[in-house]
Amino acid sequence: MKKARIFILLLLPAVVLTAGCGGGKARVGKPLPAWSEGCLDIHAVNTARGECTFLILPDGTTLTVDAGEFSSEPKKYRSMPQKPDSLTRPTRTYARYMRHFMPYKDSLDYFLLTHFHMDHLGQLEPEYGRSAGGDYVLSGVTALYDELPFREIVDRAYPAYDSLACLAMSTASLANYRRFIGRATEHNGLKAAMLRLGDSGQFPLRRRPERYPDFRITGICSNGCVWDGEKVVNHYGDGTLRENGASCGILLSYGDFDYFTAGDAGGNTRVEYPCARSIGRPVEAMKSHHHLSPHTMQDDMLAVLQPDVIVTQSFYIRDIQPDQGIIRRISESKILGAKRMYFTNIDRSLTDADPQLYARSAGIGGHIVIRVSPGGKEYCVYMLDDSDTTYTVKQADGPFRCKPQPQNTEKHE
């Protein structure tokens, strides 16, 4: 067994120097080729100062999920070094990255805010400027809109913020966001809506939808409620719902490819397993819940979703985020699914202290890109250099075949 493993490792560099999944063959040491028609791109954009995922859908429609931003060091724990440098604000990095890859440069089509925590919404910092009218501070979501406007925004509460958005950790950040929503919807033409659970039509393709009838995005969870395939079920009732458990979650499906993302709705909430049951079949990829914090990514959920790729956006120097015990459990699990774990950041002090543990990961450090080939039959995973704006490929994995959809199971509606 050991000899076989050594043989595989010796062959590995030759295998991963190039990988092609549409948009041209990607080569290690060269910039990632541009998106091309029919491909689906999922980019975990790394600034080490918040979570942000940028998607280019098969016809060029764009969707951004979250745009976290903070600059001050939390008192509880240290942050990773900011990327690409300490002088460039995270939202500027997000906008620059998106403009580089998006095929239509004028504006983003959709923005989904999963919940109202600073690492997804934006923290109010003394040095951040204000909007042109002075109505609100430019931070996270609001600053990204100032840099690169989006046409529609979806969150978990609009317009019922008084009744549904009372759980946020930072009332100041939420109040700032509400002022932004009021101003932008009234004066700038921004459309706003609450995520509709069970609805596969809230994020339609904008340019050539007729070419991609097997593409859809479905609302799965929000406000502690989960779509069970027939109805919306409240999994908290009169119990205490906290902000993480209120996160929005969506399932993106394209051909045989499925991707699930749900903010911080992890195992320390009541919705992780119900979301998996709602989806009811293996997925190719997912964002880890709550930065792979303790109690997330439980075995009952993994047994249903059986992910082949797990992407974690993390930015603190902590052995519990991502949690070492969960990395170990997932890597040793006999549950089906390749469970290749990719991390935007893990500090060198942690990897040096336990190199055997972190050697189980598929990739550490950088922007993480999942590129799905036209038709949704196969995909590749790329790690990109996050130290500059050339977006050089550091690692190329795949192509991987998607799991065929069971003949007796229809796509989630």
Say what each PLM segment does.
Residues 1-8:
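Bacterial N-terminal signal peptides that target proteins for export
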Residues 44, 49-52, 56-145, 223-324, ...:
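Active-site-proximal loop/helix segments of hydrolase catalytic cores
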Residues 69, 73, 330-339:
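Long amphipathic alpha-helical scaffold regions
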